[in-house]
Amino acid sequence: MAQSLKDLAGRLPAGPRGVGTALKLLLGAGALAYGVRESVFIVEGGQRAIFFNRIGGVQQDTILAEGLHFRIPWFQYPIIYDIRARPRKISSPTGSKDLQMVNISLRVLTRPNAAELPSMYQRLGLDYEERVLPSIVNEVLKSVVAKFNASQLITQRAQVSLLIRRELTERAKDFSLILDDVAITELSFSREYTAAVEAKQVAQQEAQRAQFLVEKAKQEQKQKIVQAEGEATAAKMLGEALSRNPGYIKLRKIRAAQNISKTIAGSQNRVYLTADNLVLNLQDEGFTRGSDSLLLKQGKK
């Protein structure tokens, strides 16, 4: 285009009249190029645009999608919105149902409603997040947290998060905002309440330990009673057996001596024990008679 203008200027006659004509052509070409550039704009991916008209204001029925668009220079101005979801973290101190101070933080994922961009611009402008989100989040948090005790905020955290999301979503609709996600990222209490909770947990653990020791003592007592009853029964049976046949104790001695002999035989050292060392007293005639009589009775059985 510049070369064409030079060629055109070369064909013009020399002198003041020719220079003036060349300047007019240059100005006209520049104005045309400027007008073309100002008449075209691009809406990038993840964006939407609306028109502001100098005569009629915001055009309510025009929402431009992504791509190349045209406008009337000086009369129409495109206003571009980013409609992609953006995260924002908001913290708010509030009070619980039992009057405990709670510091709670939310991560909110929001985006504007593309179908309502013209009315949103008229009411809130482009900085809608700063105007709306802090106020409605604080309002909803105070309303929801006040329905729960401090302990319930911990044990029923999922229910609290669901209720916050439901109320915040409904509240955001009034401002043409869409909430894609709401999550509790932090939940803390005052130092006094935290210390009281820790002291309560320690007391509960000590009480449980004391209860365990009591139950253990009871079980040990029952075990001793059962053991004592068993020993008494065994002693009674042993006494009855001895009264019926005195040779029973002699037989027990023989079996004990056999066990001792087996143990000694299995060791590496060699030890020789007599009947007296094994406490058998084999020379006693009563021992022999009692043992034979007991063995004879067991053989008959």
UniProtKB/Swiss-Prot annotation:
<comment type="function">
    <text>In the mitochondria, together with PHB, forms large ring complexes (prohibitin complexes) in the inner mitochondrial membrane (IMM) and functions as a chaperone protein that stabilizes mitochondrial respiratory enzymes and maintains mitochondrial integrity in the IMM, which is required for mitochondrial morphogenesis, neuronal survival, and normal lifespan.</text>
</comment>
<dbReference type="Pfam" id="PF01145">
    <property type="entry name" value="Band_7"/>
</dbReference>
<comment type="subunit">
    <text>The mitochondrial prohibitin complex consists of two subunits (PHB1 and PHB2), assembled into a membrane-associated ring-shaped supercomplex of approximately 1 mDa.</text>
</comment>
<keyword id="KW-0675">Receptor</keyword>
<dbReference type="InterPro" id="IPR000163">
    <property type="entry name" value="Prohibitin"/>
</dbReference>
<dbReference type="GO" id="GO:0016363">
    <property type="term" value="C:nuclear matrix"/>
</dbReference>
<keyword id="KW-0804">Transcription</keyword>
<feature type="region of interest" description="Necessary for transcriptional repression">
    <location>
        <begin position="19"/>
        <end position="49"/>
    </location>
</feature>
<dbReference type="GO" id="GO:0005743">
    <property type="term" value="C:mitochondrial inner membrane"/>
</dbReference>
<dbReference type="GO" id="GO:0035632">
    <property type="term" value="C:mitochondrial prohibitin complex"/>
</dbReference>
<feature type="region of interest" description="Necessary for transcriptional repression">
    <location>
        <begin position="150"/>
        <end position="174"/>
    </location>
</feature>
<dbReference type="GO" id="GO:0005634">
    <property type="term" value="C:nucleus"/>
</dbReference>
<keyword id="KW-0496">Mitochondrion</keyword>
<feature type="coiled-coil region">
    <location>
        <begin position="190"/>
        <end position="237"/>
    </location>
</feature>
<comment type="function">
    <text>Protein with pleiotropic attributes mediated in a cell-compartment- and tissue-specific manner, which include the plasma membrane-associated cell signaling functions, mitochondrial chaperone, and transcriptional co-regulator of transcription factors and sex steroid hormones in the nucleus.</text>
</comment>
<keyword id="KW-1003">Cell membrane</keyword>
<keyword id="KW-0175">Coiled coil</keyword>
<dbReference type="GO" id="GO:0042803">
    <property type="term" value="F:protein homodimerization activity"/>
</dbReference>
<protein>
    <recommendedName>
        <fullName>Prohibitin-2</fullName>
    </recommendedName>
</protein>
<keyword id="KW-0805">Transcription regulation</keyword>
<dbReference type="GO" id="GO:0005886">
    <property type="term" value="C:plasma membrane"/>
</dbReference>
<keyword id="KW-0472">Membrane</keyword>
<keyword id="KW-0963">Cytoplasm</keyword>
<dbReference type="GO" id="GO:0005737">
    <property type="term" value="C:cytoplasm"/>
</dbReference>
<keyword id="KW-0678">Repressor</keyword>
<keyword id="KW-0999">Mitochondrion inner membrane</keyword>
<dbReference type="InterPro" id="IPR036013">
    <property type="entry name" value="Band_7/SPFH_dom_sf"/>
</dbReference>
<dbReference type="InterPro" id="IPR001107">
    <property type="entry name" value="Band_7"/>
</dbReference>
<keyword id="KW-0539">Nucleus</keyword>
<dbReference type="GO" id="GO:0000423">
    <property type="term" value="P:mitophagy"/>
</dbReference>
<dbReference type="GO" id="GO:0009986">
    <property type="term" value="C:cell surface"/>
</dbReference>
<comment type="similarity">
    <text>Belongs to the prohibitin family.</text>
</comment>
